[in-house]
Amino acid sequence: MRLESYVQGRWIAPGGDWAGIRSAVTGAMVAEVAGGGLAMGEVLDHARRVGGPALRRLTFHQRAEMLKRLATYLNERRDGLYTLSHQTGATRADNLIDIDGGIGTLFVYASKGRRELPNATFLIDGAVEPLSRGGSFVGRHVMTPRHGCAVHINAFNFPCWGLLEKLAPAILAGVPVVTKPATITSYVAHALVRLIAESGILPDGALQCVVGPTGDLFDHLTGQDVVSFTGSADTAQLLQRHPVIAREAVHFVAERDSLNAAILGPDAGPGSPEFDLYVKEVAKEMTVKAGQKCTAIRRALAPREHVPAVIEALSRRLAGVKIGDPAREDVRMGPVVGLAQRRDVLARVEALKAEAELVFGDPARVAVEGADPEAGAFLPPLLLHCADPLRARQVHALEAFGPVCTVMGYDGLDEAATLANRGEGSLVASLYTHDPAAAADLVFGIGAYHGRLVVLDRDCAKEQTGHGSPMPHMMHGGPGRAGGGEELGGVRALHHYMQRTALQGSPAMLSRITGSWIRGAPEAIRPEHPFRCHFEDLEIGRSFHSAERTITLEDIEHFAHFTGDTFYAHMSEEATKGHPFFPGRVAHGYLLLSFAAGLFVDPDPGPVLANYGLDSLRFLKPLQPGEAIRVRLTAKEKSPRNAQYGEVRWDVEIQTAAGETAATYELLTMNAMRGA
């Protein structure tokens, strides 16, 4: 299978000499790649000129719907990816992480795009900022898609997940992608991109794939582009030093080496649920993907007195791991990705042995099921023990990217934190303790050095997603050695592909620009109640001003006894004497809300289908018996949901008869479309 690049809407064979890619399992040739023949400047230009405008014309909801259709399409055709992926050394369980996990990430971003983002082409970021005394000059931040290209350089270990977890937020943000898979597993990524291209779901130029060397691609980057890199620290540093990256201030997101730790708490001795969970997670992280995960546990920290028990329990569990042909159902660990990778892992283990003793596993003796241990890149799990981790250096600095972990003891939580932080920046650490005080000490002792912390105990053991699984909802990345970048994290990931801009102007102007009504902007008052308007007919700024209603003592007492809310401030003038907030007996805040609804609601059947919530409720002025209130209701924002209805966000202000603001909130309704 000769691998082509998918650029400018077609598959193009590279120039230059072909080089083979061998199966990690059998050593047989599975694919060929070559370099050269691609005009990288034209590839980037196609993304910027064709893909970018096509994506930016779509709203977040339309892009989200596109991601959902793509995820469904891939999910129905993933079996072929499974077959290919076995050649990389991946078991079926490994493929659940890589292939199903990647498709699942598309589904998550599709859902978040529909639920958490507006049906617009830009984002409003934060609240309105008053910039003048009289309120005629205000500020607001917006985020718009960059007019460049997202260049994604991926690692070999997750050819599907790595591609899709970067693709999803970029496409949702409205930025086209040029993806560059790692060569040794590029045949899996190539098959994935072929499926995406065949689906016809993404617009032309939204995704291009460069197989093989990137050539002079970096020479053509601009300040509107984004580079997202996953791989070794050495390669990341080389790319970040490229003169164009510095000159153009190209946004660079890096995820690099990481010496992740698992920390057994002082309370979690042998026999405890947390001890068993710790052993299970460490062993799993050593063997899933043959330990070739950026989030794998490389350092297993335990109270010094529990180290012998930890080594014994881990050795017993690792001894039961069946190694062999990953296509077999009974095999739990396949080979590393290739013979060169095996040599690299063994060389690094030898370096680690200068500070640590190999306590389980023998690289010269690997029992392999259904495959030739010499032809394939097989390794056994290798467990080391470092007796003096405070004085050691290599165990905190050198990553053997395979089924390798080092156990080390600590004396006290301060020392545990010191050892964890010796990794100089990690993607993740996991804590195994049922003691909240110990967990808090560790979280705040190591948080500055870690991108993610997982606290595991008996209460979450059955449903926890594991130390090494980055969830699309949560940020993935880490400081220092880990690269200083961030990926995923829900809609936070979109911010890498968007430009934040500060807008300043009058409330009227900014309301029109952003489609979000700002207090101080003109209101549109019509004879017809705004609740009688279908979604399409309701204009932003459409307002209703109610009549007044006086709050009586009888109202307050009836509400108190009817609801059971007999808080003293509503019931006793004497009890409120000297109160710092209340001048005397006051009305319930929720009584105000109820009266407000009675003042502004149009009761007859109509376009308003439901009120489904309140946001940002604040009670600003207490009201006493005898005071009157009135309500201003203004359509603030609209967002279509489907062909039948859309969401309307109303700005509501409850005022006193004197015009003082008593309460503010945002009311959410679903309004029907015409003809629905």
Task: Locate the predicted segments by residue.
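Conserved C-terminal structural/oligomerization subdomain of aldehyde/semialdehyde dehydrogenase
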Residues: 25-31, 65, 199-204, 223-226, ...
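Rossmann-like NAD(P) dinucleotide-binding subdomain of oxidoreductase/dehydrogenase enzymes
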Residues: 117-277, 410, 463, 485
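ALDH superfamily catalytic-core signature
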Residues: 195-200, 224-226, 234-390, 413-414, ...
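Hydrophobic beta-strand-centered segment that forms part of the acyl-chain substrate-binding groove
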Residues: 578-587, 591-636
